[in-house]
From Swiss-Prot:
CC per GO annotation: cytoplasm
Associated pathway: Purine metabolism; AMP biosynthesis via de novo pathway; AMP from IMP: step 1/2
Record's subunit section: Homodimer.
Species this protein is from: Moorella thermoacetica (strain ATCC 39073 / JCM 9320)
Name of the molecule in the record: Adenylosuccinate synthetase
Gene that specifies this protein: purA
Family membership: Belongs to the adenylosuccinate synthetase family.
Active-site residues (renumbered): D13, H41
Length: 427
């Protein structure tokens, strides 16, 4: 048995899609355990680019069992579009299964998402307006509608009617927005029910049986540790649990099943939307790094804010996830930047500390304390071993390991599958 959890160790967009793709080739089962279509994973197969939002990255390998787990909130419209797009490009999607316990996103969730964000005004949190938060709210309030409800149309229809009555009243009286038509929703979702029925399964049983049979299981996370509902920069976070503990809840396995936890770390730091960002690089230098790294959101297209590597947040990620290894991505983007800066600690009101603060107000006041390292100018995209990398590049990697206390196992030196240096394979 081998169970590996892959998590983002920063604010998401770390390059998890590429690392998941690499590990999926070696896994038997790939399960997505949280989030929704607000996530976007980009995978390069040769010179062909695939952008996935809900379907696990393992779908690009024939014969893999790919599962959308119970911790996901599923927008069936997005899923059907994604499946059709993959089929049109010759990808076999027959290995996909959807948890009957996963919750559904309905049209009114998206309407609420947009209305609530607009209502926040200057305090907006940067939601993608895809209905993720409101769907998780319904789940926590125990009024959510699950994928398994699509199998009982009478039950599904009654639940939608009940929820819609309350939601339409909320939209009208609080947000001064039009409501949604019940019949239109039922007609739309009847089509999804017919289409998705063969894919709906007891995913908890599937994944636990696979582990009992000694198969290799990869738990694919979305977003990142700093977007976790509890461990992230609250309230500028997502509505689920991207950390390793979320894999147990969102896939339905016990914590003793997990063997390794790999944190995906971008060689610099990025974040999308609002919230404090101590190592952010502003002005032309930040713009140049954004263009060099092609830092624009897979889901939204929004430009990402860019900054230097921050090992304060990485130590926090190492602790809350129990990281056993790091997959370092986009190292090639740093080529030509000299010197390089690594944040080793924060200065807060004159005091230097290495801990990541829970208080958003405190984090906004934190000033990064930097250590400078010499950069490199050699092209590293063809490197396939550690020895192929320039000495200053290896020094940067070693310093990351020293400051986080976590060994680097994988290094991405380009977007393609083959542009990966393997120091230790998780499987």
């Amino acid at each position: 048995m081998a169970a590996v959890v892959l998590v983002g160790a920063q604010w998401g967009d770390e390059g998890k899609g590429k690392i998941t793709d690499y590990l999926a080739e070696r896994a038997d089962v790939v399960i997505r355990y949280q989030g929704g279509s607000n996530a976007g994973h980009t995978v390069m197969v040769g010179h062909e680019e695939f952008k996935l939002h809900l379907v696990p990255s393992g779908i690009l390998y024939p014969g893999k069992l790919c599962i959308i787990g119970n911790g996901v909130v599923l927008d069936p419209a997005v899923l059907v579009e994604e499946l059709d797009g993959l089929a049109a490009r010759g990808v076999d999607t027959s290995g996909l299964k959807i948890s009957n316990r996963a919750h559904l996103i309905l049209p009114y969730h998206k309407g609420l998402d947009a209305a609530e964000e607009e209502h926040r005004g200057a305090a907006m949190i940067g939601t993608t307006k895809r209905g993720i938060g409101p769907a998780y709210v319904d789940k926590a309030a125990r009024t959510g509608i699950r994928v398994g409800d699509l199998l009982d149309w009478e039950e599904f229809s009654a639940k939608v009617a009940h929820n819609l009555a309350a939601t339409n009243e909320l939209l009208a009286k609080i947000y001064d927005r039009p409501g949604y038509d019940l019949q239109a929703i039922l007609e739309e979702y009847a089509g999804y029910a017919r289409r998705l029925r063969p894919l709906i399964a007891d995913s908890v049983r599937l994944v636990n049986r696979a582990l009992q049979e000694g198969r290799k299981v990869l738990f694919e996370g979305a977003q990142g540790t700093l977007l976790d509902l509890d461990q992230g920069t609250y309230p500028f976070v997502t509505s689920s649990y991207p950390v390793a503990g979320g894999a147990c809840i969102g896939a339905g396995v016990g914590p003793t099943r997990i063997d390794k936890v790999i944190g995906v770390v971008k060689a610099y730091t990025t974040r999308v939307g609002s919230g404090p960002f101590p190592t952010e690089i502003t002005g032309p230098a930040g713009d140049a790094l954004r263009q060099q790294g092609m830092e624009f959101g897979t889901t939204t297209g929004r430009p990402r804010r860019c900054g230097w590597l921050d090992t304060v947040i990485l130590r926090h990620a190492a602790e809350v996830n129990g990281l056993t290894g790091i997959a370092l991505t986009k190292l090639d983007v740093l080529t030509g930047l000299d010197p390089l800066r690594i944040c080793t600690s924060y200065r807060y009101r004159g005091t230097v500390g290495e801990d990541f603060p829970a208080s958003l107000k405190a984090l906004e006041e934190c000033e990064p304390v930097y250590e400078e390292l010499p950069g490199w100018h050699e092209d590293i995209t063809g490197a396939r071993s550690l020895d192929d990398l320039p000495a200053n590049c290896r020094r940067y990697i070693r310093r990351l390991e020293e400051l986080t206390g976590v060994p680097v196992h994988l290094i991405a030196v380009g977007p393609r599958r083959d542009q990966t240096i393997v120091l230790e394979s998780p499987f």
